[in-house]
């Protein structure tokens, strides 16, 4: 019992004095966590598209994308979100600072420049954030984010679930948004 108490004390103390992550560690962790999230969402999406088609997959995403994201965040001890300027889910709207980065990347694409794999930025509040571009890189993305016929059942389902949807009209290679990982 006493040993347990001493151990607990050390454990709590080590948490309190834990060294902040180095830049290298943040890059490594950010890359790891964002890859996990993309894989997790991608696998679910693929399964749902194959078994139920785009409308079922749409409903699955609207009900589970955020909780799957939270799960990855919890497991990694970070905060993660996906944001976009042309967002579908209002929760995923980019902030002012995030828009500035997305606009910068948008301009790079326009100039046929290659996007960085990630960007690490120290915010004015002292926190460092890892950003990773999300590009439309699969035909499957266009099913729900491309040109969708206005009178199709899918268009209706999108409109019902997301009356403010802005996330259609994308083409292959377009910047769709980014993953934001905060430490
Ligand atoms: C079955 C339809 C469907 C497909 C296919 C699909 N998405 Fe989405 N997407 C959604 C829905 C619904 C949301 C909103 C719910 C959420 O994920 O938070 C969304 C949201 C997003 C967001 C978050 C920003 C926002 O607009 O809310 C990104 C980024 C995104 N999708 C990228 C992609 C990419 C990249 C692909 C291809 C790999 C893809 N999506 C394929 C339906 C789809």
Question: What do the predicted segments below correspond to?
Answer:
Residues 2-10:
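Sec-dependent signal peptide recognition
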Residues 146:
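Short Cys/His-rich local motifs and their 1-3 flanking residues in nucleic-acid-associated proteins
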Residues 143:
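Short, cysteine/histidine-rich loop/knuckle motifs that typically chelate Zn2+
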Residues 18-140, 149-183:
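Extracytoplasmic c-type cytochrome modules immediately beyond a signal peptide or single-pass transmembrane anchor
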């Amino acid at each position: 019992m006493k040993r347990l108490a001493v151990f607990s004390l050390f454990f709590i103390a080590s948490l309190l004095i834990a060294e902040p992550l180095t830049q290298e560690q943040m890059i490594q962790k950010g890359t790891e966590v964002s890859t996990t999230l993309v894989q997790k969402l991608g696998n679910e999406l693929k399964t749902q598209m194959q078994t139920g088609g785009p409308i079922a997959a749409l409903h699955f995403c609207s009900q589970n994308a955020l909780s799957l994201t939270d799960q990855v965040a919890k497991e990694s001890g970070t905060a993660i979100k996906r944001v976009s300027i042309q967002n579908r889910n209002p929760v995923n709207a980019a902030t002012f600072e995030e828009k500035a980065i997305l606009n910068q990347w948008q301009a790079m694409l326009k100039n046929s420049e290659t996007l960085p794999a990630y960007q690490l930025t120290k915010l004015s509040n002292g926190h460092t954030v890892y950003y990773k571009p999300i590009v439309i890189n699969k035909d499957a993305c266009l099913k729900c984010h491309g040109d969708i016929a206005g009178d199709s059942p899918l268009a209706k389902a999108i409109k019902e679930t997301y009356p403010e949807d802005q996330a259609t009209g994308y083409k292959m290679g377009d910047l769709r948004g980014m993953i934001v990982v905060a430490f």
